[in-house]
From Swiss-Prot:
Entry protein name: Bifunctional purine biosynthesis protein PurH
Reaction it catalyzes: (6R)-10-formyltetrahydrofolate + 5-amino-1-(5-phospho-beta-D-ribosyl)imidazole-4-carboxamide = 5-formamido-1-(5-phospho-D-ribosyl)imidazole-4-carboxamide + (6S)-5,6,7,8-tetrahydrofolate; IMP + H2O = 5-formamido-1-(5-phospho-D-ribosyl)imidazole-4-carboxamide
Family statement: Belongs to the PurH family.
Free-text comment on this protein's domains from its UniProt entry: The IMP cyclohydrolase activity resides in the N-terminal region.
Length: 530
């Protein structure tokens, strides 16, 4: 049985008019009768395309400032009518079958994103007739084609040309899925927006913004790839991306070469890229198991890479490397000759670097583009039976935010190193301790249940690589609950400590720093990372 359905009549009503004139003309050229509404009908008529206004077809005018246009039995009967089953009813009531619906919805998200948007503005951009037509057509995909995305116009015309002006059930079903995804996302945005509002009628108010967190959490993601497995080989996995991902992210990066990214590759690349974004100077971040194992600045990225690698060459093996400048030939050569690496990501990659990396065919090379804004949005963590949702940790301090609490003031060089390793500590799993000197990590202690043991591990790692801890700055992602961490740091040769402060025993910790002649800086900001 042939499941193709010819397209003889289409209803077109779009807010986003990208490509709609060309698409409507293509349909008209193939003998399709076009129904349309409002601004879409006027645009098509101005372009010389024959159009029947929906109000002329239904005999019922658009009304209430356009709020009621398509909500009529002659429209929805034409869309929902089952061919071969409802034909007699449709004929009795003068309902013509509508074979294709081309609709996208009022720009609700764009409206509420505008500065100064009021609740009244938002309400007027809630589409009613559009979603109803979309859902009707998608429900009746056995007989009707629904098109909600401009990027599908060319595909539809091509299939009509290849299939005697008809579309297959397979295509109609695929387009119906896209339609339901479209309306689900749209309703989710509206629910999220209204979920942050608490009605406060009176005093000319219709709502007050109460919370950035809605009563229900709706967010839609599109599957970008299926994976061989997840974090472990017995776990199935896929990678989903937001509808409009942030610029310069692992989600939007272009893969130039290499094997498909794994679950762990993506997680680690994200950690490396977000860390390297913190620095204005040429920087390199090497990540292993979601923790920076080497971070450094340099005159150029080759120097930055060389210094970052020296922090912990053992852990750097099989790691992820991120840069905040273009990957050049010299740096690509140094990496490929020195170590095995899973992923390299940079804002751009020179043609010479691409050619050099090509010799390592499995190495994943990503180009993410430049970044001009900070990553925004929410962090979401799954727990059994629920989600933890919070702002992303964008907190960072400048020199003006720092408070020196010790008797000894930090030197200019110590202050510079303190700010450097404070940025690194933000991306190390708690409990996090970072030793640094001269814009280079000297030792990283990550993920220990005891802060003093993280400090000991940072020292051990530095010693293993022959790096001098004497004179280093130490950053701690959270306060020291006891003086033992300071005593251990002093024994290792640390001369300056940067930490949030806020412990009940701050006085004891500061006294320990003074006893050891150390400078101590409070940031007033914690950076737990779990």
């Amino acid at each position: 049985m042939n499941n193709a359905r010819p397209i003889r009549r289409a209803l077109i009503s779009v807010s986003d008019k990208t490509g709609i004139v060309e698409f409507a003309q293509a349909l008209a050229n193939r003998g399709v009768d076009i129904l349309s509404t409002g601004g879409t009908a006027r645009l098509l008529a101005e372009k010389g395309i024959s159009v029947t206004e929906v109000s002329d077809y239904t005999g019922f005018p658009e009304m209430m400032d356009g709020r009621v246009k398509t909500l009529h039995p002659k429209v929805h009967g034409g869309v929902l009518g089952r061919r071969g089953q409802d034909d007699d009813v449709m004929e009795t009531h003068g309902i013509n079958p509508i074979d294709m619906v081309v609709v996208n919805l009022y720009p609700f998200a764009e409206t509420v994103a505008k500065e100064g948007c009021t609740l009244a503005d938002a309400v007027e951009n809630i589409d009613i007739g559009g979603p109803t037509m979309v859902r009707s057509a998608a429900k009746n995909h056995k007989d009707v084609t629904i098109v909600v995305n401009a990027h599908d116009y060319e595909r539809v015309v091509a299939e009509m040309d290849a299939n005697e002006k008809s579309l297959t059930l397979e295509t109609r079903f695929d387009l119906a899925i896209a339609a339901f995804e479209h309306t689900a996302s749209y309703d989710g945005m509206i629910a999220n927006y209204f979920g942050t509002m608490v009605p406060s009628y009176g005093e000319n108010k219709e709502g007050d913004e109460e919370s950035k967190f809605p009563r229900t959490f709706n967010q839609q993601f599109e599957k970008k790839q299926d994976m061989r497995y997840g974090e472990n080989s017995h776990q199935a996995a896929a990678f989903y991306v937001e509808a409009n991902p942030e610029e310069a992210s692992v989600s939007t990066a272009r893969q130039i070469q290499g094997k498909a990214l794994s679950y762990n590759n993506i997680a680690d690349t994200d950690a490396a890229l977000e860390c390297v974004k913190e620095f204005d100077e040429p920087a390199c971040v090497i990540v292993k198991h979601a923790n920076p194992c080497g971070v450094a600045l340099g005159e150029d990225i080759l120097e930055a890479y060389d210094r970052a690698f020296k922090t912990d060459p053992t852990s750097a093996f099989g790691g992820i490397i991120a840069f905040n400048r273009e990957l050049d030939a010299a740096t690509a050569t140094a990496i490929t000759e020195r170590q095995f690496v899973e992923v390299i990501i940079a804002p751009s990659v020179s043609a010479e670097a691409v050619a050099i990396v090509a010799a390592k065919k499995n190495l994943r090379l990503l180009e993410c583009g430049e970044w001009t804004t900070k990553t925004t949005g929410f962090d979401v963590k799954r727990v059994n039976g629920g989600l933890l949702v919070q702002d992303r940790d964008q907190g960072m301090v400048s020199e003006d935010d720092l408070k020196v609490v010790s008797k000894r003031q930090p030197t200019a060089e110590e202050l510079k190193d303190a700010l450097f390793c404070w940025k690194v500590a933000k991306y190390v799993k708690s409990n996090a301790i970072v030793y640094s000197k001269g814009d280079m990590t000297i030792g990283v202690g990550a993920g220990q249940m005891s802060r003093v043991y993280s400090a000991k591990i940072a020292g051990i790692k530095a010693a293993d690589e022959g790096l001098q801890v004497e004179g280093c700055v130490m950053a701690s992602d959270a306060f020291f609950p006891f003086r033992d961490g300071i005593d251990a740091a002093a024994e290792a040769g640390i001369k300056c400590v940067i930490q949030p402060g806020g412990s009940m025993r701050d006085d004891e910790v500061i006294a320990a720093a003074d006893e050891h002649g150390m400078a101590m800086i409070f940031t007033g900001m914690r950076h737990f990372r779990h």
